[in-house]
Curated annotation (Swiss-Prot):
Substrates-to-products reaction catalysed: GTP + H2O = GDP + phosphate + H(+)
Domain of life (superkingdom): Bacteria
GO biological process: positive regulation of translation
Lineage: Bacteria, Pseudomonadati, Chlamydiota, Chlamydiia, Chlamydiales
Subcellular location: Cell inner membrane
Name of the protein: Elongation factor 4
Length: 602
């Protein structure tokens, strides 16, 4: 790989809300810099998963190195693409830490949206040079003057020289490249000679093993070096090869130098060994201090995943193991359920992360699976002072020994057109939200700041927000603190037998309505038996809702033609005794559709 003067290197990222054209602009930049040959070009080149293309989102960060001749000088432009969704905000923050600048892409028709706002604030915290770009200016609904004013008023960026572009037609792309070179500062010349490299991602390749994506801050990294991860402490690894993204990961000779972005492979066994945000240094001459900002990624949302056919358990285990190779944030623990059999308790960064894993298992491994209702981590403080972290209703202790329960809360920003304000306030009130402030984004739109329990967000908040705002509302959230809450375990009993798959942890105020809706749904989906089946929702053995599935009645007197009524009475009495015995010893078979229908309530 050609060596570049550090002042000719530009590391930048692209910040955009879902569907504002981030991947398409990346495509145009690759075309304009001749990084990709025309015959290899396709839409959303950096989005390698089918799921990313279909949903129009970036799930996994994809770096790429471009070379560009500008005013007689050759520049190396490193685009460190980032996932846009709030679930992956820590990965976004680490990717932004590897950059000196960012393009803020805003749809010229839709304007500023919640997730682009959240990521802009992350970039501002890291003192990045932000270049505002208005995309889709070829749309009839585009209003560049109003949207530019919105960016200036709410984000505080100077939009005097805002770039208007259309990724579809290629208009404005040369202006973006010029702005990257002129406005994004080059990497700072290192003050020390020891190797310091920021890990901003990792990828498992079936042929070469784990590839660690790094941005070199100081020192040099080359094949044969022995390196250590400073946060992991302990193990030393030999670098077996280094490479760059041209745009595909390509092995190179020589070394990775300060300011450059690339990857290395070493004798690493598991993705878990590589932590995003960690600092790589040499084992013999280590850096004195690691780079700032590292933290462990912990799952926020938990759900059980079970195969519909129990014989698929080993296939599901293999599928989750393979997905975990490329996703260190996914946690897996084997568990068993009385009603669903053997499965796994999985931890995710958020609801989108859960949906993506669920969909990939179905698509890539052709498995039929059930996911239990998503849950969060509650802190249960016992009377003896011990604190338990509970993410599964089955682990909830006896209420008699509980002092109190604390639940996680989040800070939420909602952007909405003005006319839907009352709808959103009613929705947030129903979700136990606390309004912090309301601000005007422009003449037509508002920004609402709320505090909400995380449990209310992970169920159906996004769907309901889209519903009450006719699709125009958007939101992002960040984790806040734990607060005391009246959280209780709701049990569902079928024929007086508790069914663990339907149990859930809910707020006391919502327990009755939740219990009633589960009972009503089960009455519709469980087939009738020859005996009466009671369906009950209970809290601490006290029934709060009940429905009954009526028995199938067989006409036992069909063969009696007229005659004495006592003969009929004997047959009815015999039937009654049989049904009583059946109720005591009969088993209710619950179809898989019942589990799926109840989970749809979430």
């Amino acid at each position: 790989m050609k060596e570049y003067k550090i002042e000719n290197i530009r590391n930048f990222s692209i910040i955009a809300h879902i569907d504002h054209g981030k991947s398409t602009i990346a495509d145009r930049l690759l075309e304009s810099t001749s990084t990709v040959e025309e015959r290899e070009m396709r839409e959303q080149l950096l989005d390698s998963m089918d799921l990313e293309r279909e949903r129009g989102i970036t799930i996994k960060a994809h770096p790429v190195t471009m070379t560009y001749l500008y005013e007689g000088e050759v520049y190396q432009l490193n685009l460190i693409d980032t996932p846009g969704h709030v679930d992956f905000s820590y990965e976004v923050s680490r990717s932004l830490s590897a950059c000196e600048g960012a393009l803020l892409i805003v749809d010229a028709a839709q304007g500023v949206q919640a997730q682009s706002l959240a990521n802009v604030y992350l970039a501002l915290e890291r003192d990045l040079e932000i270049i505002p770009v208005l995309n889709k200016i070829d749309l009839p609904a585009a209003d560049p003057v109003r949207i530019a004013q919105q960016i200036e008023d709410y984000i505080g960026l100077d939009t005097t020289n805002i770039i208007a572009c259309s990724a579809k037609t290629g208009q404005g792309i040369p202006a973006i490249l010029k702005a990257i070179i002129d406005l994004v500062p080059p990497p700072k010349a290192p003050a020390e000679t020891e190797l310091k490299a920021l890990v901003f991602d990792s990828h498992y390749d079936p042929y070469v093993g784990i590839m660690v994506y790094v941005r070199i801050i100081s020192g040099e990294l080359k094949k044969g070096d022995r390196i250590t991860f400073m946060a992991a402490k302990g193990s030393s690894f030999e670098v077996l090869g280094i490479g760059a993204f041209l745009p595909k990961a390509t092995f190179i000779e020589g070394s990775l130098r300060p300011g450059q972005v690339g990857f290395f492979i070493a004798n690493l066994k598991k993705v878990k060994d590589v932590k995003i945000g960690d600092t790589v240094t040499k084992t013999k001459h280590p850096a004195k201090t690691p780079l700032e900002g590292f933290k462990e990624i912990n799952p926020v949302v938990f759900a059980g995943i079970y195969p519909i056919d129990s014989s698929d358990f080993d296939t599901l285990k293999d599928a989750l193991g393979r997905l975990q190779l490329n996703d260190s944030a996914l946690t897996i623990e084997q568990e068993s359920s009385h009603s669903l059999g053997f499965g796994f308790r999985c931890g995710f960064l958020g609801l989108l992360h859960l949906e993506i894993i669920f969909e990939r298992i179905i698509r890539e491994f052709d498995l039929d699976i059930i996911a239990t209702a998503p849950s969060v981590i509650y802190k249960v403080v016992l009377k003896n002072g011990k604190v338990l972290d509970i993410d599964n209703p089955s682990g909830y202790p006896d209420p008699a020994i509980i002092e109190h329960v604390e639940e996680p809360w989040v800070h939420v920003n909602i952007i909405t057109p003005q006319e839907y304000l009352s709808n959103i306030m009613n929705l947030c009130l129903d979700k136990r939200g606390i309004c912090v402030k309301t601000e005007m984004l422009d003449q037509h739109r508002l920004v609402l700041a709320y505090e909400l329990p995380l449990n209310e967000i992970v169920s159906d908040f996004n769907d309901k927000l889209k519903s009450v705002t006719k699709g125009y509302g958007s939101f992002d959230y960040r984790l806040g603190d734990y607060r005391k809450g009246s959280i209780i375990k709701l049990e569902v009993l079928i024929n007086e037998e508790p069914i663990d798959a339907f149990s859930c942890l809910v707020h006391r105020d919502k327990a009755e309505s939740r219990g009633r809706s589960i009972c009503e749904k089960l009455v519709d989906v469980i087939p009738q038996q020859l005996f009466k089946i009671p369906i009950q929702a209970a809290i601490n053995k006290k029934v709060i809702a009940r429905e009954t599935i009526r028995a199938l009645s067989k006409n036992v007197t069909a063969k009696c033609y007229g005659g004495d009524i006592t003969r009929k009475r004997k047959l009815w009495e015999k039937q009654k005794k049989g049904k009583k015995r059946m109720k005591e010893f009969g088993k209710v078979s619950i179809p898989n559709t019942a589990f799926i229908e109840v989970l749809k309530l979430d």
